[in-house]
Amino acid sequence: GYRTMKITDEFLVKGYYRNYDGMHLLKHALHNTCPDMMKSIGKDEHGNDIKVRDSEGIQLANAKIDEIRNGFSEWLEEQSPQFKERLTTMYNRKFNCFVRPKYDGSHQTFPDLNLKGLASRGIRSVYPSQMDCVWMLKQNGGGICDHEVGTGKTLIMCIAAHEMKRLNLAHKPMIIGLKANVAEIAATYQAAYPNARILYASEKDFSTANRVRFFNNIKNNDYDCVIMSHDQFGKIPQSPELQQRILQAELDTVEENLEVLRQQGKNVSRAMLKGLEKRKHNLEAKLEKVEHAIKSRTDDVVDFKQMGIDHIFIDESHQFKNLTFNTRHDRVAGLGNSEGSQKALNMLFAIRTIQERTGKDLGATFLSGTTISNSLTELYLLFKYLRPKELERQDIRCFDAWSAIFAKKTTDFEFNVTNNVVQKERCLLYTSPS
């Protein structure tokens, strides 16, 4: 087709092995990637090129890609008012349609709360911040409590769990915490609500001999709250059918990303392709294992779905931050391990079980003094855990789609361990959609 001089000359980046014109760079701008440019620094003993990354070429390509993005904004400014208004309306309805509410829980009376019992544990009253947080959780059916250490997250969990049960917002809530803290959580709940039916899991309950009986106990009884440690929670089997659906959805996203990269041909790095192919292989292995579990399952296994838990409070929720995610980016620093941990994946299975039961997002409350510690990936993963339906409404199915809207990559140059200057990409800037 017809190509203007602007495409073929002005936006041309000359590499050692090949050139990249404006059309190539436009594709990279749309996919939020950059050409993987190499150059030769000599020959090896067999006469083959010794290849290294062409940092100068990549830097120039990044500059041209930024120019294309800025040019798109300039092009938009030149369009008719009607076109801009229509585009703005479409964007705002999809991404910029939320206003952060202010929650005032001062009107709550907490009729079953035993303040005398709490006083024996050194708790004199419920802080306004705790009331506001409980009101937020009751209104939304869960959320994030990012209060600092010492601001009373334990009491928030206990009151919110009991209030949800009292108001039929949840029928069987669960609280999980660190092994060192979970006894304190159970004692606080018992002091706050001495008449509540609480099931607190001991180490003996989770012994191999007693575990099946304990799981059936959760399933067959109407407890006000079930309390256990993170480690104990990890021993609860998850529904294999639900695992199969989630892993298949992850695999579908990986295959979509692979197809996008293959369409770009040699414009993308082998490492990027290799990373996604490895992830695909790992997911296929997990799916095979789950399918085997479905075929060989016995009737006496009680899984999380059968227990009837319909809300889970996760104290120190940052312990589950290493959730699996899909990305095409292989050279962006600070993204973490996209494979994630089995511990976090197990939590995703549990939260999805609750969300499928209730037919809506949330169904869980994350409590931590360090909700986000060191990367934007953790922010995306909070949405993945808690707001899957909203992400689907926004057509966000992977980290790359989310970061293209809400984040921006920055490129810096720094010295590596061999004192050479290397390019480092980071997902640093959070861009508000407003």
Model-derived regions, located:
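Conserved P-loop NTPase motor "coupling/switch" region that bridges the ATPase
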Residues: 191, 195-204, 248-277, 311, ...
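Conserved helicase motor
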Residues: 201-209, 231
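Conserved RecA-like ASCE ATPase "motif II neighborhood" in helicase/translocase motors
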Residues: 229-257, 272, 279-307, 342-350
